[in-house]
Regions:
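Proteins synthesized as precursors that undergo proteolytic processing into mature forms
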Residues: 345-373, 380-381, 451-504
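Sec/Tat signal peptide C-region and signal peptidase I cleavage site
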Residues: 17-21
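Glycine- and hydrophobic-rich flexible loops that cap the catalytic core of alpha/beta enzyme folds
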Residues: 236-247, 253-256, 262-405
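N-terminal leader/propeptide and maturation segments of large enzyme subunits in energy/redox metabolism
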Residues: 85-122, 126-138, 306, 328, ...
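Hydrophobic alpha-helical segments
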Residues: 241, 370-478, 553
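Bacterial N-terminal signal peptides
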Residues: 5-15
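Substrate-recognition/specificity elements adjacent to catalytic centers across diverse enzyme folds
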Residues: 23-226, 234-237, 241-249, 254, ...
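Acidic, low-complexity N-terminal propeptides/linkers enriched in Ser/Thr/Asp/Gly that mediate export
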Residues: 118-216, 221-222, 368, 380-384, ...
Length: 724
């Protein structure tokens, strides 16, 4: 690794020259802008209309930049491994991680050989953003002064984490930074990580009141990660839903005939290989079969910001035919192999938005690049479907693929990909409903679900979760669904995780001698929990007690659960002692009394939604305005998810993830939908649409979606061309 300091004039000379009015490129932008109409509805949501798909993409990117250019740019700064250029040395190894997989030279070559139609869209993508910067000279990009079409390939799939983020920057620092820092381990009393994921439901016409397919879209993401948009062209594009900032396709959404919803999958879509490395002179080789192959060594440069100006670090990185080396384990170098098909991924991401039937949607799934996600589908023909993951390598089942495998053994090579038919898949199950909550597919449609014994172990690495249990409860016992009753099911307040936990706590209390001071201390709390219906509400004191008790117990025994390789939930219910359970309740009660004056504090007084600024990392303040939220963390089985905690300087808990864009859709001769987003459309605190959806968000009161142009009548705030 080498370090260099770049003189300021080098940095300035590398920056792109801003466009001028005399630039013929500007004339082209102006001409395209005249072919685009943006209609902002009374929630500030942009409905973009254009003759060609490319015109709509141009307008979409302009509208996104208007709403939150910072988030648009930041997503691509991160995707290209350039965070350290604005955030400094702390981001060096995050950037190195991205640069291991995202190489500008390679991306430019892939762009050059992309299909003409896709290149046209990528050009429109860059033009829309650059036109915004031209029209808004007061906006200073942090890093990307001019967007280039090839850059769209660096962020070609819409999920939050993706496969690359499975690589630990800490491990990269230990290996390439030559620092003996060890792997990060959770602290003994660390707060359990907030569950990620999403919910998707599809209800067949046979199980709905109007005999039309119903669809529930409920991604659980960090707040403000996606914007709500509509894209309409004269080339068959008419799509509505959530677009990840900076991308030109709707990721979770629907068109006039079909809808799709992605949930993070438990399928094993990547592998790590233990490479046996042999050094000969200054070169590295690795064993493969009976031979030794030369390891590829290349230089990656990571520029980073310092108080004195820009500097850079150069790393010599290594690769085998499996992929880049990401860490070392017991003397073996670990290579990672994952999907790297940006052109196909962008093709699939866009093409599915125009798929209006199951057959057409199924065809997009055959590109196999939606690697880390399951998909729920419904359409106006009455079809409902579940697709399990979309990139599952075929492997030799003799190996344990949950761990790194021997890279020197040719038998560990992938043998192609599993087809849709070879993967867990459902089409119109007899149950009349299907769902996924990031759990296994083997309960996706009740008795109609795929059978676990029909598939290799690597096809699904997870299991059931509390949301899955809850989903079956609300879907299997209800007939004649309507949009209203499906919303009610999705916001059902039951917390099934406490079905085992609360009885175990009460049993601990009942088995403790009456003379115990600990029993006396928690007697009133136990009486409340004994009569609790295990439903959340903003007025519920038992919800407060149960959540704080559960979190305290998790903190107390989390390390023990990990050491025994058990899930924390299983450990809580089966391995904790009566004293641990009661002690955790006493500790939680003391914490509540210290922070809020009494343990008898209603849940809504603690669990709050707040949006004070447009910062990507939000600040929170108990002195600022906020709203009560009834629904809890998904950890406890709440289908409506709200991941909240206290922050430095706060006692109240503020949410940063969970329900984000939420929608219910009814398909038929026409499409009807309702939706709500966390906060509002705009990232500007001065905008009336910064927080105008917050009350509806916290109460589950979805608003009407204006899908058809005539529905915008009397609901239009502004109609304009980009640049006006």
């Amino acid at each position: 690794m080498q370090k260099f300091v770049l003189p300021l004039f080098v940095l300035l000379s590398a920056a792109s020259t801003p466009a001028s009015a005399a630039d013929p490129v500007v004339a082209r932008w102006e001409q395209q802008a005249r072919r685009v109409t943006i209609v902002r509805d009374d929630w500030g949501i942009p409905h973009i209309y254009g003759k060609r798909d490319a015109d709509v993409v141009f307008g979409l990117m302009y509208a996104q930049a208007e709403d939150d250019f910072n988030r648009v740019e930041t997503n691509f700064i991160n995707a290209m491994g350039r965070l350290a250029e604005t955030e400094g040395s702390a981001a060096i190894y995050r950037d190195l991680r991205m640069k291991l997989f995202v190489d500008p030279v390679s991306m430019k070559a892939k762009y050059a050989t992309s299909p003409a139609w896709l290149k046209t869209l990528m050009i429109a993508w860059a033009d829309g953003l650059n036109f915004y910067l031209y029209k808004h000279p007061e906006v200073t990009p942090r890093v990307i002064a001019r967007f280039e079409p090839w850059m769209a390939l660096t962020f070609s799939e819409g999920s939050i984490g993706g496969d690359i983020e499975q690589v630990s920057p800490r491990d990269l620092e230990a290996f390439y930074g030559k620092r003996a820092i060890g792997r990060a381990l959770p602290e003994k009393d660390a707060r359990p990580a907030e569950p990620g994921g999403s919910n998707g439901f599809a209800i067949a016409p046979s199980n709905t009141a109007n005999r039309r397919a119903l669809f529930w879209i409920n991604p659980h993401t960090s707040f403000f990660f996606r914007a709500e948009v509509q894209m309409v062209s004269e080339e068959g594009l008419n799509v509505y839903g959530a677009v990840t900032w900076g991308q030109f396709f709707v990721y979770q959404g629907f068109n006039d005939r079909a809808g799709w919803m992605h949930t993070t999958s438990g399928a094993d879509d990547l592998d790590e290989y233990l490479e046996t490395v042999v050094k000969k002179g200054d070169k590295h080789f690795y064993r493969y079969g009976t031979t030794e192959r030369p390891m590829t060594a290349t230089t990656i440069t990571v520029p980073y910001k310092t108080p004195a100006g820009m500097a850079k670090k150069e790393f010599t990185v290594y690769r085998t035919h499996h992929g880049p080396i990401i860490r070392e384990v017991d003397g073996k170098w670990v290579a990672i192999k994952l999907m790297q098909e940006p052109v196909k991924a962008l093709t699939q991401s866009y093409a599915r938005t125009k798929a209006r039937t199951y057959k057409a949607f199924r065809k997009t799934m055959e590109l196999h690049t939606n690697s880390s996600n399951n998909t729920i589908f419904a359409d106006a023909d009455g079809d409902i479907a579940y697709f399990h993951a979309n990139f599952i390598p075929k492997r030799d089942p003799r190996f344990d693929w949950s761990k790194p495998v021997d890279g020197s053994d040719p038998a560990t090579e992938w043998k192609g990909l599993h087809s849709v038919e070879e993967s867990p898949h459902l089409l119109n199950p007899a149950s009349g409903w299907l769902y996924n909550t990031n759990n296994s597919p083997f309960s996706a449609a009740g008795a109609s679900s795929p059978k676990k014994t029909d598939y290799p172990a690597y096809m699904e690495t997870g299991g059931e979760n509390a949301r899955g249990i809850h989903a079956i409860r609300v879907l299997s016992t209800k007939k004649d669904f309507t949009p209203t009753s499906l919303i009610a099911a999705a916001f059902d307040s039951y917390l099934p995780a406490f079905d085992d936990l609360i009885p175990s706590l009460i049993a601990a209390y009942d088995g403790t001698p009456a003379t115990s001071p600990l029993r006396t201390k928690v007697a009133e709390q136990i009486a409340l929990l004994r009569g609790w219906d295990r439903r959340w509400s903003i007025l519920s004191i038992p919800t407060t007690l149960a959540v704080f008790w559960g979190e305290e117990l998790q903190r107390a025994v989390g390390a023990d659960a990990r050491s025994e390789e058990l899930s924390v939930d299983e450990y809580l219910a089966k391995r904790t002692t009566p004293e641990q359970r009661l002690r955790a309740l006493a500790t939680a009660s003391d914490k509540l009394a210290a922070d809020f004056g009494s343990w008898k504090t209603p849940w809504g007084d603690i669990n709050r939604f707040q949006r004070l600024t447009g910062d990507i990392v939000q600040p929170f303040s108990d002195a600022g305005p906020s709203l009560p939220v009834g629904f809890t963390s998904a950890r406890w089985g709440s289908l409506a998810s709200f991941g909240a905690r206290a922050y430095p300087g706060t006692k109240k808990h503020y949410g940063t993830s969970g329900n984000s864009f939420v929608a219910v859709v009814e398909f038929g001769d026409s499409v009807r939908a309702k939706a709500v987003s966390a906060g509002g459309q705009s990232g500007d605190p001065k905008s009336p649409h910064f927080i105008d959806q917050a009350v509806r968000y916290t109460t589950g009161e979805l608003r009407d979606v204006y899908f058809y142009r005539h529905q915008l009548k009397n609901h239009t705030e502004r109609t304009y061309h980009p640049g006006q």
